[in-house]
Amino acid sequence: MIVGFLVIRQSDQRRWGRYQIERDMYFQMYPYQLDPLLPFSVVVPLGYIAQRKLQNELMLKFNQEVIYITALVQREEARQNQTYVVQVRIHDHKVGELEPKYAEKLCLNLAQTDFFIGRPISLQAEITVFQKSEIECGCRIKLNLPPDPQSADEYVIRNNKDDAKRI
């Protein structure tokens, strides 16, 4: 009897693990979309290393104009001092995180969606390259998230045939 229970429990754990992997792959293939008509109002704080990584990845130079690129925002697991952490990724590289207060309001607003369990939101990012000194340049990222995160659910568009309508 105990052996049967252990076999069933182990089988259930494997099935749950496979489900989580398949769910994550599905979420990456079909992220939520954000209404592209929103203004670029949310600035992502970038550290020096993130700026250098972004400049190398996208081969950014100072003489370029503003660049528009697709980015993903995705909720991460909670940390000791932060319950809601939302990362910003470009080309599968984490470049920064949303500010904690904005991230908390955004997560609470989208709590009834798959975003809360890890489904990313695809949106446009505006990258501006500026010159820090004669030999060094930096960059700034603005996202077209709504200025008020408590209205975000009005702008999220689901991206598959089952969820073709707005949230």
Predicted regions and their residues:
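Conserved active-site motif detector
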Residues: 1-167
